[in-house]
């Protein structure tokens, strides 16, 4: 998310607890942060595809081939996780547009600026997320 941070930091603006929660300026700030993060992931994905296409060499040594296949599998797993992250970013951008961004989907209360800074795709407050995870653990243990 390095580029996302760089693009958002072009402005000195930082959301503050002293202003109305999710005002137009905050919404625009988080929208830009999400868009920059998405663009960074897409750029990395394009680089991966390019790298994988170039690396079609045949390894004579079995160990080299195994190592290359392991690297390739790891790269593809990483890209799959990032594909899922793009979906979460797109969902967050839709919430920005419909005005529900920044509010807990469970309680309707503000998620909090610090949490959104750390995890811009968050859909629940810390407390609601902890309750959700406890319920999941209980159901998993059944």
UniProtKB/Swiss-Prot annotation:
Instruction: Quote any Pfam family the record assigns.
Output: DksA_N
Gene this protein is translated from: dksA
Bias kind Basic and acidic residues: ranges? 128-142
Which GO cellular component terms are attached? Answer: cytoplasm
| SUPFAM superfamilies from the UniProt entry | DnaK suppressor protein DksA, alpha-hairpin domain, Glucocorticoid receptor-like (DNA-binding domain)
Keyword Ribosomal protein on this protein?
no
Q: What is its main location?
A: cytoplasm
**Location of region: Disordered:** 1-20, 51-70, 119-142
Q: Which family does it belong to?
A: Belongs to the DksA family.
- Give the ZnF (dksA C4-type) ranges: 104-128
By what name is this protein known? RNA polymerase-binding transcription factor DksA
Q: Which InterPro entries does the protein's record reference?
A: DksA_N (IPR048489), DksA_RNA_pol-bd (IPR012784), DnaK_N (IPR037187), Znf_DskA_TraR (IPR000962), Znf_DskA_TraR_CS (IPR020458)
Q: Which GO terms describe its molecular function?
A: zinc ion binding
Q: Which GO terms describe its biological process?
A: regulation of gene expression
